Amino acid sequence: MLKTRTAPWRNLFAMMALATGLSAGPAAAAEFVMKFGTATINETQHQFIKMYKEALEKATNGRIEVQIYPASQLGPIPREIEGVQLGSIQGYIGPVDFYVGLDPRYGVFSAPMLFRDDANVAATIHDPAIQAIILGMAAPKRMVGIATLTLGTAAYAAKSAMLRLDDFKGKKLRINGTALERAKMSRLGATGIAMPLSEVAPGLSQGTIDGTISGLSVFVGFKMNNLVRTITVTNDTFLVSLAVVSQAWLDKLPPDLRKAVIDVGQEVQPKAQAWEVDFTKQLADDWVKLGGQVHMLPADDLARMKTLLESVGDEVTKDQPAVHELLLKVREAAKRH
């Protein structure tokens, strides 16, 4: 049953890759090939890699060829990150939540009620002091952070619509897997099930999960309208993405190319972030065109949610000094911007 359901998705992604030339072999002039993966498709992370490819190949005069692998073509998210550490995959971009196994401080960004809106998130993570921390945390894990991006609000959707706050109770909702997410789900009366993006559609089909927390772009990009119809927006949490490259691979490059790989990440970051702002504006309409609806919780439910969730960050991190310290730094930066 699982094989039958998932095969069309794989075929679709393969056809998309072929249609856009993503799986083409390295150009004759390229001295090095950089496989750059992500779990998503046709959204900001995918767009970042496209922009990065164009800029890096130009900056290196074609000495490095960037190959683009969206939609988990290089494996589930944990395997992609592991591949970057080992050097078998040269680049990856994904939500910081998935890096918590390497450094629990990455989980700070999933604290509810931390940011006001998407613009506040962008200003905070691009604050020089905060960005230096985010990028620097990857270094001890044989990865080099090259860019951070926002991906919009983390929205909720389930097979049975969640129109009121009480509708969360009893549901098994897919999360990225941080302790803060689990605590948030518990406060709402739900259960958080950690799961990489590539397993969400099968999980919904088979009943392993009742719903998922994802960006609007995921629901639209993967055309999940055949699995869920109503997306519930609360703006309690926002998604932050981190692009990393392999230190093992960088060590094999001459100094000039090594510098270009890192510098181009910072060059592309503001361009991709600007693209994200425009892209996000159309997502709700795109979902409606697919036959879905976007629902905002009523004001009284949003107020109750804030009361339930605003202490989660401090409560979960209080016994982890390094994690709590970063939470306080991010919170202060968010207030400042």
Could you describe each region identified by the protein language model?
Residues 4-7, 21, 61:
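N-terminal compositionally biased, intrinsically disordered segments and leader/signal-like regions
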Residues 23-29:
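Sec/Tat signal peptide C-region and signal peptidase I cleavage site
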